[in-house]
Amino acid sequence: MRWVRALLKNASLAGAPKYIEHFSKFSPSPLSMKQFLDFGSSNACEKTSFTFLRQELPVRLANIMKEINLLPDRVLGTPSVQLVQSWYVQSLLDIMEFLDKDPEDHRTLSQFTDALVTIRNRHNDVVPTMAQGVLEYKDTYGDDPVSNQNIQYFLDRFYLSRISIRMLINQHTLIFDGSTNPAHPKHIGSIDPNCSVSDVVKDAYDMAKLLCDKYYMASPDLEIQEVNATNANQPIHMVYVPSHLYHMLFELFKNAMRATVESHESSLTLPPIKIMVALGEEDLSIKMSDRGGGVPLRKIERLFSYMYSTAPTPQPGTGGTPLAGFGYGLPISRLYAKYFQGDLQLFSMEGFGTDAVIYLKALSTDSVERLPVYNKSAWRHYQTIQEAGDWCVPSTEPKNTSTYRVS
């Protein structure tokens, strides 16, 4: 019986390239925050969601799977990247099982929800596993500027695609699993229609403070100020995914606290971390200001690079959060901001401190998913060969101009 199951599995895996080729021809369909809310409103239809997801999830999976294959062979050959590929193939095949199923069958809908939970759990470790693949590549082959550029481009798109896929899965499973989250009864799936920005700020600060106190035995205080330009003197609320905002803020607080404590080791008091939340007609901006000594300008963009992490390589079985050891906190946080058309930027003054600004869309109709699509433009990016720069590179030693004198 075991060999029969193996035969069937191999037969289904053989069909994967055909599915990838087919679904990658379609572009993903980005949803706005308002559409997510409408999808999950009180009259939400599970059949409609099922019909949409069994087409949309394969499109998103297939698009990014085509890009995985464009990575350098030396990256694709690492055990970790091959493992991630196998997860994506299996998840695509899992959804294919429902392509011709009847949405009127309640058992089918229940099985689909169970399949989505299985897929979500299967992909829980995608980020650290892919990060391990990058480390395996670097340890074996060292640094290659062209490959590094392609890997950075790919990982931004790959992780953003992953965020979007988990968003779709979470919305469906949270809304249609037949239960209500007692801690957040008014949430629609993972979305809070009336998210208090300051409350999320305080939650992220409290958790970061807990870690900082545990490690350094001290932590800076928090000061929050709100400016509501659209409705003066009213607390600032928005339609957003609190877990996404928390992820961004928690990462920024950790960085700000560490910098503040380490740059004021000899001081009796620590300067506070200041938060400014401003709501305008288009943007909701959150600025975090610290007095942690700042970062040189040349290092700012490197903080968002997957290839230049200064964090120590995590060791298996040492406990803690694996992601922390890869130095991916800031790059992933910026992707969470960009996912709904926002951004995360750092402005630093070396010798003083750093301002980190999260930009989000104020209106739910403007908060539209930012999704990678596999097309000729993306393909060409991976074929680009780095050429010589067209700007002078400063020399470390002044030139002897006497050699250029006209005789």
Curated annotation (Swiss-Prot):
Phenotype of the disrupted gene, per the record: No visible phenotype, due to the fact that PDK2-deficient mice have increased PDK1 levels. Mice have lower blood glucose levels in the fed state, but not after fasting. Likewise, they display increased pyruvate dehydrogenase activity in liver and skeletal muscle in the fed state, but not after fasting. Fasting mice lacking both PDK2 and PDK4 show strongly decreased blood glucose levels, increased circulating ketone body levels leading to ketoacidosis with dangerously low blood pH levels, hypothermia, and ultimately death.
Subcellular localization(s) per the UniProt record: Mitochondrion matrix
A single GO BP: intrinsic apoptotic signaling pathway by p53 class mediator
GO cellular-component term (any): nucleoplasm
Positions annotated to bind ATP: 251-258, 290, 309-310, 325-330
Keywords: ATP-binding, Kinase, Mitochondrion, Nucleotide-binding, Phosphoprotein, Transferase, Transit peptide
Class of this enzyme: transferase
Positions bearing N6-succinyllysine: K376
Protein name (Swiss-Prot/TrEMBL): [Pyruvate dehydrogenase (acetyl-transferring)] kinase isozyme 2, mitochondrial
Species per Swiss-Prot/TrEMBL record: Mus musculus (Mouse)
